[in-house]
Amino acid sequence: MLLACSSSSNSAAPSDAGAGGDAALDGSASEGSTTLPDGAPLPREHLRIVAGNLSTGNNQNYDSGEGERIFTGLKGDVILIQEFNIGDKSPAAAQTFVETVCGPGCSYFQEPPATYNIPNGIITRFPILASGSWDDPSTTDRDFAWAQIDLPGPVDLYAVSVHLLTTGATQRATQATNLVALVNANVPAGSYVVIGGDLNTENRSEAATTTFDSIVDTEAPYPADAAKNDNTNQPRSKPHDWVMASPNLMASIVPVTIGAQSFSAGLVVDTRVYSPIADLAPALTTDSAATSMQHMAVVRDFMIPTE
């Protein structure tokens, strides 16, 4: 369901409105330029993208509050969420969660919990123009959730929230191949693309990541914590979670700055080690240690041109 506080849709088609390569080129500055024709710097908008499978407890939901607090503290502009189960799984419950982690007026798409056992979703403070689920034939309890987001400026963002299988690298490679084909078939050329979430990858060189690298950047440097640990499962031993952006969006990447700290390639958020934790309020030091906490959140920041 796509909700911007009121309306809903489960299978909206992609739209060319505001998106595509031509839209990026018919303004006052050429693609890749950092200045206007008169030499003035391009006006830019800060964009924070957060991915996280932060469900906790025995029922793969957010009801215990730990994941909700982490998302809230990170102040994401676009959140790629997995295992998006809230309360009684009603639209009202999801709306309350969205307003808590993102704020009043934020939009979201959630794969219908009545259909999907562990749905993916996208939450954003920007308008969602179209959204839906692309079929993932490898699994029945979630698909590839996507949304076309109307960012400030001439280029739209196509955000895809994914949760790949744990059954093996071969299966994940197949899922990646299918998703790349779907993006190539459905996303207008020149659009920003971000694919993020719980890939369940065992290492950074799995075939799935090589496949994704044809449309989004999967190369180092990677988001990490202050100790330079870029692993994202709860024991912090494997790189399960990713925020992967298309080259035209990566051209605008900037360090993630929270409080007095700056993380040049992005941040892996583990409340057990993040200090000072007050920077992530209302998150608590104990949140990432919650029972059955799935993984750590991943954050990347961008400064996108608005003209």
Where on the chain are the PLM-derived regions?
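Metal-dependent phosphoester-hydrolase catalytic domains
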Residues: 185-194, 201-307
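Loop/turn elements at helix/coil->beta-strand transitions in domains of secreted/extracellular proteins
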Residues: 43-49, 74-79, 102-107, 127-129, ...
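Stable alpha-helical elements in mature extracytoplasmic
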Residues: 63-67, 80, 90-97, 119, ...
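Structured beta-strand-rich core segments of catalytic domains in phosphoester-bond hydrolases
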Residues: 85-156, 164
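Active-site beta-strand/loop signature of hydrolases that rely on acidic residues for catalysis
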Residues: 47-54, 70-92, 159, 179-210, ...
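Active-site-proximal beta-strand elements of phosphoester/diester hydrolases
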Residues: 46-57, 130-134, 156-166
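Ser/Thr-rich, Pro/Gly/Ala-heavy low-complexity intrinsically disordered linkers and tails
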Residues: 2-41
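Extracytoplasmic/secreted cell-surface and envelope-processing proteins
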Residues: 59-61, 87-93, 118-119, 131-132, ...
